[in-house]
């Protein structure tokens, strides 16, 4: 379901031409080529992203990709239309922010595998959102967990600290909602494309974040990507990367939360 009927102003990348941006976006659809391999290709082709996209098998091997990745890329590339993808984003008024744009969040840029492209619905404010804290926890929240989460989220919002979370049931939804109710900012990081809100029960909350002007939905996944289980660790690293710290208000011994807090500690900001 689309949540950006009345979005903030659409803008393409400020650092790339539309043709270049189309290829950057197209690469986000290629399974097996993430931020590290994409940077490898850009380095080899001297920032000529069109050359990287259209490279032959031998050139891709010389760039450092292994055989299975090359074969997979060539198969996926054959059914891709970079210009059409960009036109769809523009039609839906999705903001596209690349790692080279000034609008790209400064904290996120510091992590080792920062997303090359962010898809955004709503409003990111680079300066204000640099003061951000992640609030995460269980989906099966207790009355005490709700109370504590509301207390912290309200205090942070009133102190002009952006609340970052993952739009999940439980702690995430409470954190987002409380921040909005307190007049603060909140960023919801998704494990799917912007057109697939998960869980669907939080579609109203997602829409409120976008339409309020108090925050944004953010994802590295292109339109149409469903919330597969493997996407959640990637989502969590973005929550971590956007945040000055992570607050777990209530959680079982849950792998996802453990990975998220461990990921934050591994960043140089936690040194």
Q: What residue ranges belong to the model's regions?
A:
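Glycine-biased, small-residue-rich flexible motifs in mid-sequence functional cores and linkers
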Residues: 1-20, 98-271
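Short, small/acidic-rich helices and loops at N termini and domain boundaries
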Residues: 1-102
């Amino acid at each position: 379901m689309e949540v950006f009927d009345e979005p903030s102003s659409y803008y393409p990348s400020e650092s790339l031409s539309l043709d270049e941006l189309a290829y950057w976006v197209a690469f986000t659809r290629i399974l097996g080529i993430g931020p590290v391999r994409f940077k490898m290709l850009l380095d080899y082709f001297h920032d000529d992203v069109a050359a990287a996209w259209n490279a032959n098998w031998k050139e891709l091997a010389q760039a450092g990709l292994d055989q299975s990745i090359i074969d997979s890329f060539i198969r996926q590339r054959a059914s891709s239309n970079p210009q059409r993808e960009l036109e769809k984003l523009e039609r839906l008024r999705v903001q596209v922010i690349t790692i080279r744009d000034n609008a790209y969040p400064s904290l996120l840029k510091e992590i080792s595998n920062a997303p090359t492209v962010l898809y955004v619905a709503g409003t990111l404010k680079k300066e204000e959102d640099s003061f951000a804290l992640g609030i995460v926890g269980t989906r099966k929240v207790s009355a005490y967990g709700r109370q504590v989460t509301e207390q912290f989220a309200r205090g942070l919002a009133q102190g002009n600290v952006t609340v970052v979370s993952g739009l999940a049931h439980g702690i995430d939804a409470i954190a987002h909602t409380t921040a909005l109710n307190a007049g603060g900012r909140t960023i919801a990081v998704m494990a799917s494309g912007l057109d697939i809100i998960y869980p669907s029960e939080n579609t109203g909350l997602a829409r409120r974040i976008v339409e309020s002007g108090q925050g944004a939905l953010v994802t590295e996944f292109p339109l149409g990507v469903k919330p597969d289980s493997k996407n959640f660790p990637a989502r969590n690293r973005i929550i971590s990367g956007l945040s000055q710290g992570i607050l777990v208000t209530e959680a079982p011994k849950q792998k996802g939360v453990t990975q998220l807090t461990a990921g934050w500690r591994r960043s140089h900001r936690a040194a």
